[in-house]
Amino acid sequence: MTLRPLALAAALLACTLAFPNMAATAKQPASAPAHAEDGIAWFKGDVDTAFAYAKKHNKPLFLYWGAVWCPPCNQVKSTVFNRQGFIERSRFFVPVHIDGDSPSAQKLGARFKVRGYPTMILFSPDGNEITRLPGEVDSERYLQVLELGMSAGHSVKDTLVLAQSDSSKLTPEDWRLLAYYSWDEDEGQIVAAKALPATLQKLAAACPPGDTGVHLGLSALVAAATAEPANQPATDKAAANALLLRVLNDAKLARDNMDILTNYAGDIAGYASAAGTPERARLTETFNAALEKLADDTSLSKADRIAAVDAKVAIARLDAPQGPLAPALVEEVKQRVALADRETTDLYERQSVINNAGHTLTDAGLLDESDTLLKSELKRSHSPYYYMLSLAANAKKRGDNTAALDWYEQAYGASKGPATRLQWGANYLANLIDLAPADDKRIEKTADSIIGELAGTQNAFYERNRTALEKIGKKMTTWNAGGAHDAVFKRIRQEFQGVCDKLPASDPQKATCAAVM
């Protein structure tokens, strides 16, 4: 799915953490608030049993995994899973909810090739993946895409093969299945990441004219704008500019594609126009007008409306990233954030709304206001440790390394769940090395804590856990370059090796563990 590119490093960590277990699939951690989706009969049992049940009863299987703290997950719970339309449809498939901190989570992540939170996959009754659903679209569009997947004659993978061999054979439904596939969560299953921009560009060019083609065209533009330069296909910038103007000037098209317009405003506007040109001026003016309408659109979720305001900030910073914003825009940010804060009472929804609001304040240069909002939420949130990462990032942005490390430490200390604690700990340790490299004692103490918990974590060397540990290994190796911290480094490495030694020789995790340090 397409998640907005959050400005704070905390959020970048946030939506890409661990994945679920087996036996406790239908259970939330004790710290979670009451279910917003109580009407859904989540399957009680492990994943393999769920697939067997789906096959026996000839039902598709809907697999959702997320985390208690994850803002986009809470957004889905408060805008999709609590909808009567979704609850009614859930009776026609086997719904499986896997919590990200359950013991087999990372191993499942490797099995299903998933990383980001939330990921939602629809499988056929025989266990083949049909599609990955985009969690960033509004609830009505989500239900339409879900219905499309349930009635699809073939998978997105097979549909793509057909599109690449003879696109004339695709039906309008086939094109919609491709257009609304969660390409950001593909993880290279269908298309290698490097090839995605060019692939989407070709699909957009082949798609018949209409709303589906517009969405594919915008998706291709996002992929190109956010790709590494070496992976960017040749793009007709004038055509890209024209596509954006067409969408922005059409209220329905803008509303239908609000996820792209709000999440990637700065990226696509910057890619489709050059700084200081009349084309840039016209595009940004038109963008602002469309975003203003989206921010006022009460049919959108509060989180999406705040995202539209943040997009206005991104547009304003296109040509002057560090410059002051117009006073009117600064005042608008303050007022819209205050309104969203007052009007959002649901705890699930607040986790997403306050996250967006905090980032919007930060992006607007209102660090003190962002801190005030986030600190207030610490008392209210079911997962305050998530917001502590944002507070750390704000302090880091100010250049206050002491305060930043204090918040990273608090976040690690307050975090819950084995996968979450490992990732929060890795983040804290990485920042310690960056911001206080001479503090050997604190670095060793933190590493000892992480390794101590690691020894009791099942499947600790799969997927996101593995990525976090590899990050630690690289950081510490660089930190000790030339033997600058050799005594501490050797003690930490020896302690880590003790974890590796306890793994059975036949366990594939053993080689991964040995390579970390």
Question: Where are the predicted features?
Answer:
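Thiol-based oxidoreductase modules, predominantly thioredoxin-like and allied folds used
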Residues: 40-45, 65-66, 83-105
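Structural micro-motif
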Residues: 59-61, 106, 110-122
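Conserved redox-active cysteine motifs that mediate thiol-disulfide chemistry
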Residues: 65-80
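Non-catalytic, surface beta->alpha helical segment in thiol-disulfide oxidoreductase systems
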Residues: 114-156
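Alpha-helical repeat scaffolds
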Residues: 159-163, 190-207, 231-252, 264, ...
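Generic helix N-cap/helix-start motif at coil->alpha-helix transitions
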Residues: 169-175, 209-220, 253-268, 299-317, ...
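Residue at a conserved register position within TPR or TPR-like alpha-solenoid repeats
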Residues: 316, 361, 395, 432-433, ...
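Structural motif corresponding to the intra-repeat A-B loop/turn of tetratricopeptide repeats
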Residues: 364, 398, 435-437
